[in-house]
């Protein structure tokens, strides 16, 4: 799981500075992201207490995962119509070493 991967320090080795998740409070396209937050946010945060994990809700916004790395590099992944499991896999992908390139 992403929380376990991050707790092993993988994110730290990449220079991962912040994770942001943008979603809509009501849209069907953000349902999987809302499910992910309800089911997995606490575990993820407990495994990564020093990593800022920001949840940003905004009406009619397309759900998206942002990872900010050292030197201002960012990676983003659209999450529209993803299930909670797909959101988990997207998060795991941004924690991989090859993910730390600018998008």
UniProtKB/Swiss-Prot annotation:
Is DNA repair among this UniProt entry's keywords? no
Q: Which family does it belong to?
A: Belongs to the complex I NDUFA2 subunit family.
Q: Which cysteines are joined by disulfide bonds?
A: 24-58
Q: Which protein are we looking at? A: NADH dehydrogenase [ubiquinone] 1 alpha subcomplex subunit 2
Compartment(s) where it occurs, according to its Swiss-Prot or TrEMBL record? Mitochondrion inner membrane
So what does this one do?
Answer: Accessory subunit of the mitochondrial membrane respiratory chain NADH dehydrogenase (Complex I), that is believed not to be involved in catalysis. Complex I functions in the transfer of electrons from NADH to the respiratory chain. The immediate electron acceptor for the enzyme is believed to be ubiquinone.
Write down the PANTHER family for this protein, in alphabetical order: NADH DEHYDROGENASE [UBIQUINONE] 1 ALPHA SUBCOMPLEX SUBUNIT 2, NADH-UBIQUINONE OXIDOREDUCTASE B8 SUBUNIT
On this chain, the residues bearing N6-succinyllysine are 64
Q: Name one GO cellular component term.
A: respiratory chain complex I
The annotated subunit structure for this chain is: Complex I is composed of 45 different subunits.
N-acetylalanine-modified residues are 2
Instruction: Give the source species.
Output: Pongo abelii
What topology does the record note for this protein and the membrane?
Peripheral membrane protein
- Which positions carry N6-acetyllysine? 64, 75
